[in-house]
Amino acid sequence: MQNISPKVQNQINMLQQMQQQMQTILSQKSQYELAAQEARRAVEELKETDDSAAVYMNVGTVVMQKPKSEVISKVTEKIETLEIRIRSIEKQEKMLQEKFEKLQSQVRSEIEGRKTPDAN
């Protein structure tokens, strides 16, 4: 590691930062996917519920009784919003992965390029 140029050391630091960003992105994606899955289950349960049944929904810090159709509509909107966020995160993930792989390849080339003259 002592023979590594400052440029390569900087690139290695950038790779580490990208890994941390990727972990953050994957964590967010996982949270959104879980929330979307829970919301889909809620919609399925609501659809199976009798139309005359009391349905409650969080409105800020208050739980209020709402018409079943309104709750289904609100939860469906939430699912759509979460799916948009998931797709956006997947795009970020793909772009970051491509940048990571490109930079990783450059670092490998630099390191292997430095090792080759020493072997001769």
Curated annotation (Swiss-Prot):
Localization of this protein: Cytoplasm
Chief place where the protein resides: cytoplasm
Cysteine pairs bridged by disulfides in the record: none
A cellular-component GO term for this protein: prefoldin complex
Key words of the record: Chaperone, Cytoplasm
UniProt xrefs under InterPro entries: PFD_beta-like, PfdB, Prefoldin
Signal peptide positions (record): none
GO molecular function term, any single one: unfolded protein binding
Origin: domain of life: Archaea
One of the protein's GO biological processes: protein folding
HAMAP family associated with the record: PfdB
Described function: Molecular chaperone capable of stabilizing a range of proteins. Seems to fulfill an ATP-independent, HSP70-like function in archaeal de novo protein folding.
Family the entry assigns: Belongs to the prefoldin subunit beta family.
Subunit structure and binding partners: Heterohexamer of two alpha and four beta subunits.
Protein name, per record: Prefoldin subunit beta
Organism: Methanospirillum hungatei JF-1 (strain ATCC 27890 / DSM 864 / NBRC 100397 / JF-1)
Organism lineage: Archaea, Methanobacteriati, Methanobacteriota, Stenosarchaea group, Methanomicrobia
